[in-house]
């Protein structure tokens, strides 16, 4: 199995292809990407037969920016007979996967695939039963075993394969299913909520998103991102010349600071979180984020970088490299992750967690 399917946002196939080609090449896993515009997926075909599995096991999925999900697959199954689609799929998976822990029958995230999605939902139940009968799936779902993927690209046409549960997206189609809260001031609130689900392990939420923490929201108006912090019982400094939603001010947890997010400097030294969703050039936002992290003004940050029309992967890579260089230069040890989220549009979301100062004798306790 030498092909890897990567699901992505429709319209960002070229960026997804450029990224996987670059990062696979750095691990000496060579191949080429098959790209179809607005298809919502990319196929990276490795030159060596076993390199597909090697790629999805060795390259951390969390290091990918434009992929929502990935899995290794074999050849395309075509012209599945409508009276029995199950037998050929079972045949393709037998001997390839043993005791998979979960089945996901998926499609790309496009308008054309919506009808196909209805079929996938109905088809999952009988296919799961058949795969359990032959030992491709365990009798009960388990997160400790590989995930079996059946990916339909058209009626009667699908790829079959698997991903590793410790190195994939835990979400169906790589998309967390979030509901817009009716009392939130703007739909942008879903961007931050999704970022928290993607970047922070669930078992660390109580510690890293704790009641009573102090947070700063730069460019906060009208308060979509502030809403998420307030919901987690944090005290929030919302920085923006524009007004905040009255519903947030009424909580008593929000201090509205009417000033420019680029000029604001915090006057406390116990800020756990800084979040930022400002419409500005990526380089300017990245420089501001580097300043906050280098000075220890916050422990963790989530921010958005708005993308240009062309060379979007190169632009993101350049800004992340600049941020890493600034942290290295000032002896700050940090984890950096970036992802184009489902609720992002022409942008990517970046999460940085400051761990400790790497300089001997210094420890970051702020």
From Swiss-Prot:
Q: Which UniProt keywords apply?
A: Cytoplasm, Methyltransferase, rRNA processing, S-adenosyl-L-methionine, Transferase
Pfam families assigned to the protein according to its UniProt record, in alphabetical order? FtsJ, RlmM_FDX, RLMM_N
Gene name as annotated: rlmM
The name this protein goes by in its record: Ribosomal RNA large subunit methyltransferase M
Q: SUPFAM superfamilies, from UniProt?
A: S-adenosyl-L-methionine-dependent methyltransferases
Biological processes, Gene Ontology terms: methylation; rRNA processing
What role does this protein play? Catalyzes the 2'-O-methylation at nucleotide C2498 in 23S rRNA.
> What are its GO cellular component terms?
cytoplasm
Subcellular localization is given as:
Cytoplasm
What InterPro entries has UniProt attached to this entry? Answer: RlmM_FDX, RlmM_THUMP-like, RNA_MeTrfase_FtsJ_dom, rRNA_MeTrfase_M, SAM-dependent_MTases_sf
Which regions span the lipid bilayer?
none
